[in-house]
Each structure stands twice: as structure tokens, then as C-alpha cells.
Amino acid sequence: MNLSTKFQGHPYHIVSASPWPFFLSVVLFFNCLAATLYLHGYKHSSVFFGISFLGLLATMYLWFRDMSTEANIHGAHTKAVTKGLKIGFMLFLISETFLFASIFWAFFHSSLSPTFELGAVWPPVGIADKTIDPLEVPLLNTVILLTSGASLTYAHYSLIARNRENALKGLYMTIALSFLFLGGQAYEYWNAPFTISDSVYGASFYFATGLHGIHIIVGTILLLAATYNIYTYHLTNTHHNGFECGIYYWHFCDVVWLFLYLTIYIWGS
């Protein structure tokens, strides 16, 4: 195989055929189906969800592996391609902003003008004495998430300064903090005195915080991929587009959590 067939001779982003978008859509469908069955109390639905979630992780790993090969071995991620990927990711974050804006809209729609069915008060009758104290686990999780943002920034600037060891240390700390945050969320859910079916308050609370938790899981996967690429010398101080996208995503989750903490945990309760 000569160089003309092994490397592309243009700077543009020509998408090669890949099975992973199709497989990702399939496993996402089964994830949603399993979650719906679990909420309706179907037997063995949690096992079904676990299997489908493992399929999601496997598909993401295989897709990331192919993208890493295209970028680091095939040389497909030229400056023009990298610029296009960054613009696409920024547009994706804008769409995510509107998604969370709709959730906050639903929350304020119910809380600013509570109906008679809710007792004309917020939190609703029966929930007011069950809300989660914002100065306990939520405050700890806020500190953890903001600290993870600082350690991730440290890792980024260490990579730019060609200090691979400190970049890895910063990423290790960020990933450890992300697991602590998810553990705090799981503990909070397990001990919460209300459920997702307890009025619009419970639905808004679990939908907003749960969706944010899913974003933290996805962000952790992105950072794990970046850690692997730095560890295997695939990323340099000038070539780390995937890592930068993961950083943008993580800081986006930080900002969303601050809004969640101030509105739902403090003001809303």
C-alpha cells in the first residue's frame, strides 16, 4: 500500500463508513426501554438495563478507538477537520443548553405559580417537610464538582506545557472526584424521602439531577478516553482536540450543576 492510498491528500473531513452510529442508536433505544420498564416495576428490568448499559459502554469504546486511529495513525484530523469538529461540538453544547433550559422552564412554570392541586404552595403539600437539605450532600457535591473543574484545568495546562506526568495526575484526580460525585448522588437518591412520582416536584428534581448525572457519566468516559490517549503518547501539547472537547463538556456540566444547586436545592426547597 503506497502513501497515496494510506493517507488522504486533502484537508477536508470525509466521513468514512462506520457501523457505530447505528449500533449506538440501537443500544440507546434498549437503554430507554429498560429504564421505562424499570420505572413501571417490571421484573428483571434492572438486569436488562445493566446489559444494555454495558452495550452502550462497549459501543462508545469501539467508536472512540476508531476515531483515535483516524486521528493519530491515519492522519485524518487535519487543521480544517479539527476546526470543523470543534464547531460541531460547540453547536452540540448549545443544543444541550436548550435542553436544560427546557427543564428549568418546567421547574419554574410549576414553582412560580403552583396550582390548587399542589396546595397553591411550593414545595407542594406533603413535600415541604421532605426536601433535601442543600447544606449537606448537595453542598459537598458542589465542592467536589468545582474542585474537579480546577484539577481538569490543571491537567489541560500541564499538557500544553508538555508536562505529561502532571497532566495525568490532574486527570486521575478529576476522574476520582467524578466517581465521588456520582457516589454522592447515588447516596442522596437512596436516602431521599420522596420519589420521582411524588408530584411535579419529585418529577422535576429527579429528571433534572438525573439527566445531569448522566452527563457526568458521559463526561467521565470522555476523560477516561483522554487519559488513555495521553498515557499512550497519542496526544501532544498542540494535538489534543478530543481532550479539549471533553474539557468543554465537563465545564458545561459544572455550570449546569451550579444552576441546579441554586434553583432546585436552595431556592426550590
UniProtKB/Swiss-Prot annotation:
- Can you name this protein? Cytochrome c oxidase subunit 3
Compartment annotation: Mitochondrion inner membrane
The transmembrane segments are: 19-39, 44-64, 87-107, 135-155, 170-190, 205-225, 247-267
Q: Which catalysed reactions does the entry list for this protein? A: 4 Fe(II)-[cytochrome c] + O2 + 8 H(+)(in) = 4 Fe(III)-[cytochrome c] + 2 H2O + 4 H(+)(out)
Q: What GO MF terms are annotated? A: cytochrome-c oxidase activity
Name the EC number(s).
7.1.1.9
Question: Is 4Fe-4S there in the keyword field?
Answer: no
Alphabetic keyword roster: Membrane, Mitochondrion, Mitochondrion inner membrane, Translocase, Transmembrane, Transmembrane helix
The record ties this protein, via PROSITE patterns, to: COX3
Q: Which family does it belong to?
A: Belongs to the cytochrome c oxidase subunit 3 family.
- Gene encoding the protein: cox3
Main localization of the protein?
A: mitochondrion
What function is annotated for this protein? Answer: Component of the cytochrome c oxidase, the last enzyme in the mitochondrial electron transport chain which drives oxidative phosphorylation. The respiratory chain contains 3 multisubunit complexes succinate dehydrogenase (complex II, CII), ubiquinol-cytochrome c oxidoreductase (cytochrome b-c1 complex, complex III, CIII) and cytochrome c oxidase (complex IV, CIV), that cooperate to transfer electrons derived from NADH and succinate to molecular oxygen, creating an electrochemical gradient over the inner membrane that drives transmembrane transport and the ATP synthase.
Biological processes annotated in GO: mitochondrial electron transport, cytochrome c to oxygen
Q: Show the GO cellular component annotation of the record.
A: mitochondrial inner membrane; mitochondrion; respiratory chain complex IV
Quote the InterPro entries the UniProt record gives: Cyt_c/ubiquinol_Oxase_su3, Cyt_c_oxase_su3_dom, Cyt_c_oxidase-like_su3, Cyt_c_oxidase_su3-like_sf, Cyt_c_oxidase_su3_a-hlx
